[in-house]
Amino acid sequence: MNTLSYKTVSANSATVNKEWVLVDADGQTLGRLSSKVAKLIRGKYKPNYTPHVDCGDNVVIINAEKIVLTGNKWRDKSYIRHTGYPGGQRSLTATEMFEKDPTRLIEKAVKGMLPKNILGAALFRNLYVYAGGEHKQAGQKPKAINLNDLK
């Protein structure tokens, strides 16, 4: 008796098909852009998604300087860090961080949406953020996609 068997496909480093994707951040809201980029990096839009494998795409983000924050977040949102010394807690507002380096806003938002382990660190290395419209990954021929088409 022959039965139909649907086996679960588990990806590994040999069977993963990684692509280069170009995302334009011009006019995009920070959180919505970051969550979709984190899903792209993680590989959740692919049918062979496997949680413990780096099966996502390499993502290049351009125009990070044109990102949008809603409400009063430019003034009220704070990024806190600690120097490691007693009384060494420091904080920056979103505006101050943006003036120092516009790419850090997107990088911190996406990194916070990835797993907090070795896989998350490896996935974060698949993200390339540029403040302007030019990028250094032209040799990889990234495919431009519209994030509004993704769920």
Placement of each model-derived feature along the sequence:
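Ribosome large-subunit tunnel/peptidyl-transferase-proximal elements
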Residues: 1-108, 118, 136, 141-151
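Hydrophobic, well-ordered secondary-structure segments
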Residues: 106-107, 111, 124
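C-terminal structural segments of small proteins and small subunits
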Residues: 120-130, 136
